[in-house]
Amino acid sequence: MNDCFGAVWSNLGTFLGALKGLSASEAMDLAPEGGFCLSTRSQSASENWVWLPPDLVTPERAEAALRFFGERGLPFVWPLPGDCGAAEALRGVGLKEAGRLEAMSLPAGAAPERGGKELTFRTVRTREEALRWASVAWLAFGGEPPVPVSVLNGAEAMAASPLRLGMAMAGEEAVGTFLLSSFEASLGVYYFAVLPEYRRRGAAMAMMGEVLRAAKELGTERIVLQATPAGVPFYRAAGFEAHGAIPLFSNSDDVF
């Protein structure tokens, strides 16, 4: 695992650990050394996770994770760092590789691209703003109204935590979302999305410029994220480098 991939991987684990501690989440520890099942009570697989260092993966722990989510009737994802031996234990209990994320990073000193000059940015601080953030994120990622209660509750809990939720604003209209999670010298970017009607108008580049500004403000060395296949071209255009795949094992065929 190279340093850049390691920064992406470690930031993801820290972010999921922060979600584990929220009132809107339900979790179960899997190993004394670390690792857990995390339910956000969402019906979306990508909102429910198993996090376990690959050297701690065993068939017994995989079966425990299956029971945890099976009892709740929820889909989930289980990321692994590349093609490692732990994958066989997951396949052995019936999980399959259902998709891959790309580990990507960008030096915090990079020059932001121009775009979306009409946009301003707002840090989510109130319950009303959190619910608005949740609605925009849900729609921007392709969800249909109404916004699930689990998504609304999760956003409200995240807004009250050390995680930083941001909204891109066109006047008083919220048009994009992102979430920032710091760990050591990395700043993780999550829930980065723009409403369909504002795509290809510079909004996403302007949002990335705001992320870069925040990274410099925090003294971060590197911005990290896990990109879906659909997001990789944009992040490459924004200057991100790819560091390898993160396979997602799941009990569902639909993980994005």
Outline where the language-model segments fall:
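N-terminal charged segments
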Residues: 1-72, 87
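A short, well-structured alpha-helix characteristic of acyl/acetyltransferase catalytic modules
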Residues: 127-139
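Acyl-donor-binding surface of acyltransferase catalytic domains
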Residues: 54-128, 227, 249-251
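A short helix-loop-beta-strand connector motif used in the catalytic cores of GNAT acetyltransferases and
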Residues: 21-29, 72-75, 81, 98-101, ...
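A conserved beta-turn-beta hairpin within the catalytic core of GNAT-like acetyltransferases
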Residues: 43-49, 98, 181-190, 199
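Conserved acetyl-CoA-binding loop-helix of GNAT-fold acetyltransferases
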Residues: 58-67, 191-194, 200-213, 217, ...
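Conserved active-site alpha-helix within GNAT-family acetyltransferase domains
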Residues: 84-97, 205, 217, 229-245
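A conserved beta-strand-loop-helix scaffold within acyl/acetyltransferase catalytic domains
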Residues: 145-195
